[in-house]
Amino acid sequence: MADSGSDAPISNRPEEEVTVEKTPEMEAAAEEERLRYLEFVQQAAAQVLVLAAAAYAYAKQGAGPLRPGVDHVEGTVKAVVGPVYDRFHGVPLDLLKFLDRKVGESVQELDRRVPPVVKEAPGLARSAAAEVRQAGLVGTATGLAKSAIARAEPRARDLYTRYEPVAERKAAEAWAALNRLPLVPSVTRAVLPAAASLSARYNTAVADGAKRGSAVATYLPLVPTERLSRVFGYPLADAAASPAPEMQPIPSQ
């Protein structure tokens, strides 16, 4: 017999896996492939596909004598997961890219009409997508609420400073007019001590909760008991030249 044309030894070892390192150009292309605004939609679609595949594989594990039961489970899984799978499976990446571009155009249009905070939309969208994956919607809602409060607080403080004196004066005038009615002074003398006690207890509870780090307590307002005592305890000087006995300060008990 003629010798083989190749004297190289035959190796039974499997071929080594070749690892391809990503170049900066490849990473840039992959980054461009990601969605800027609708990344969370892509993540939701991927999670639905994984859950559907896992449920289908679980239904297939019991082949054999229990096949009729497995077929029943498989049919149930298809009936429940199938519509969700079909809905997300039919949304190609090109369509998501199109929607993402439309969102971007809307943000750019809004950028000319609203404050610069809109410029942070792409970063906020990525941050929201990460929060949804890590902590769920509850944590995201809490963070967004805190952010909204932080942005609205300066404006609210300005409005409060501007209109507080007017509101305080109107409240005192209304209180003085109300005390002219029969029986009102005697009723308020009976009610105010209990109301003052409850207000003080409420303020103490809120302050203690804030010291313990309660997130809810930090947003609860305190009852301005001293200001209420000053406003409602004494009639305005110009409310009447000679106030009637009903308008005299309510004695504390």
UniProtKB/Swiss-Prot annotation:
Region Disordered, annotated ranges: 1-26
Basic and acidic residues bias (residue ranges): 13-26
PANTHER family (alphabetical): REF/SRPP-LIKE PROTEIN OS05G0151300/LOC_OS05G05940, REF_SRPP-LIKE PROTEIN OS05G0151300_LOC_OS05G05940
Family: Belongs to the REF/SRPP family.
This protein's name: REF/SRPP-like protein OsI_017815
